[in-house]
From Swiss-Prot:
Protein's recorded name: Ribose import ATP-binding protein RbsA
Highest taxon above the source species: Bacteria
EC primary class: translocase
InterPro entries named among the record's database cross-references: AAA+_ATPase, ABC_carbohydrate_import_ATPase, ABC_transporter-like_ATP-bd, ABC_transporter-like_CS, P-loop_NTPase
Length: 501
């Protein structure tokens, strides 16, 4: 294989932070190279330097052995670098062809769009990827996997020979992820070099050739995939051995106070009617395949989605909860699946995000915010959940995924919530940060807070939950507890391998 990309002795600093220190990284033609590290290790900064978003303070970039100087994102794309970020750059109301050629549309001598030519090129790229996409539909009508293939097609239309894929399977089903891997293998055979960023070790071992590990802005080492064990990689990432990321479970008490009694939640007329209870200080897991109705049931309970029938009591009192605001007044908070879009205001500081839902708590006469009091509350709560940041004035958009999730938790602690709904709480979060989130959840339940945890990661559901409600096709088919909370039992019920008793 030929050396396609070399990053040599790259360093980058921000005010008060040394983000990268003397990092070197090499990508071969036709290689899939994993870039591993905890959130905050420097992966995103390094890739933003590669794609021209940031300019390095020291070091150089070489493509095909020749030095390049990227002062802008377009410089990188012109040099054959394509990046598929976690947050897609697609315009939702435009179709796939329009998105692929956005900003560089093909036109004739009169300035008219050459739509047939653009469509023909788009079809050719899709054939190269071996994907079948409705090129005429607005991209927001496509599945997440199809949108991702549009992003890849967009990069390939620019003759990208270097692709960076940042957590590409985070929102994909297993079948969609396998389809993506087939596409990646095809591109690999065509000589495209790929940088693959993922926190899922099984994916690294399935698709990658080589691994480079970063920690705290330093390169810890690189390894061939077939020559390194998972435990060694984890130790390289976090700087210590990880024996078990899940906290020890305490014996389940069946006599605990019932905080939520959902006697009936029906999303659609003639649809299934679900019922469940949540006890004080327990973690109730919602498990099931993607599209099984887990999130929809939780959102309907708190009024974020409509329900044609809802009978719910909170601490023994009937609760209509027609809106999330009413649910919040009842002491129920939601940590949404998409924390960046729905859980946080990224340009706002840590302080502003923590106090946003309860400004009355930090306001004085005439409802004027007491900045000193606000800062004290934010600092106390951020310390409690161990947010890693220079100070509470740091914009949350500058934080790692794990620290962003901690800010969302701190916000709900500021509201003294009795029940927290965690929707995919560790999605896009590294191993070390996951352990901290689990520790926080355990601390909250020890203080009497009840948690509903919706997760697509079976080890997480099994390792954290006291009881598990298993969903299939919109219906809770079984509630497991004790020794029955294991991966085999959950999958048997989730896939229809057994009937509910």
């Amino acid at each position: 294989m030929n050396s396609l990309l070399s990053l040599e002795h790259i360093s980058k600093g921000f005010p008060g932070v040394r983000a990268l220190n003397d990092i070197s990284f090499e990508l071969q033609s036709g290689e899939i190279h994993a870039l591993l590290g905890e959130n905050g290790a420097g992966k995103s900064t390094l890739m933003k330097i590669l794609c021209g978003v940031y300019k390095q303070d020291a070091g150089r970039i070489l493509i095909d052995g020749a030095p390049v100087d990227f002062r802008h994102y377009h410089d990188a794309t012109d040099a054959g670098v394509g990046v598929i970020f976690q947050e897609f750059s697609l315009i939702p109301y435009l179709n796939a062809v329009e998105n692929i050629f956005l900003g560089r549309e093909l036109r004739n001598a009169l300035g008219m769009l050459r739509k047939k030519d653009m469509r023909a090129q788009a079809e050719k790229i899709c054939q190269r990827l071996d994907v079948n996409i409705d090129l005429d539909a607005p991209v927001d009508h496509l599945s997440v996997a199809e949108q991702q293939f549009v992003e890849i097609a967009k990069a390939l239309s620019l003759d990208a020979r270097i692709l960076v894929l940042d957590e590409p399977t985070a929102t994909l089903t297993p079948n969609e992820a396998e389809h993506l891997f087939r596409v990646m293998r095809e591109l690999k055979a065509q000589g495209v070099g790929m940088v693959f960023i993922s926190h899922h070790m099984e994916e690294i071992y399935e698709i990658c050739d080589r691994i480079t590990v970063l920690r705290d802005g330093e390169k810890i080492g690189d390894r061939e995939v077939g020559e390194v064990a998972v435990d060694e990689l984890l130790e390289m990432m976090v700087g210590r051995k990880i024996s078990n990321s899940f906290p020890e479970k305490t014996p389940l008490r069946n006599d605990g106070d019932i905080v939520i009694d959902a006697r009936a939640i029906q999303l659609h007329k003639n649809g299934p009617v679900n019922s469940f209870q949540v006890r004080k200080g327990e973690i109730l897991g919602f498990a099931g395949l993607v599209g099984s109705g887990r999130t929809e049931t939780a959102l309907a309970m708190i009024g974020a989605l409509p329900a044609c029938r809802k009978e719910v009591s909170v601490e023994g009192e009937p609760a209509a909860m027609k809106t999330p605001a009413e649910a919040l007044r009842r002491g129920i908070g939601l940590l949404p699946e998409s924390r960046k879009k729905e859980g946080l205001i990224l340009p706002f500081s840590i302080r502003e995000n923590i106090t946003l839902n309860n400004l009355a708590k930090v306001s004085g006469a005439a409802s004027v915010i007491d900045r000193k009091r606000e800062s004290e509350v934010a600092e106390t709560l951020s310390a409690k959940v161990r947010v890693k940041a220079p100070d509470c004035e740091t914009p949350v958009g500058n934080l790692s995924g794990g620290n962003q999730q901690k800010v969302v938790i701190a916000r709900w602690l500021n509201n003294d919530c009795k029940v927290l709904i965690f929707d995919e709480p560790t999605r896009g979060i590294d191993v070390g940060a996951k352990t901290e989130i689990y520790r926080l959840m355990k601390q909250l339940t020890a203080q009497g807070v009840s948690i509903i945890m919706i997760s697509s990661e079976l080890p997480e559901v099994v390792g954290v939950s006291d009881r598990v409600a298993v969903f299939r096709q919109g219906s809770i088919v079984k509630i497991l507890e004790g020794d029955a909370v294991n991966s085999n039992e959950i999958m048997r019920y989730a896939t229809g391998g057994v009937k509910d008793e």
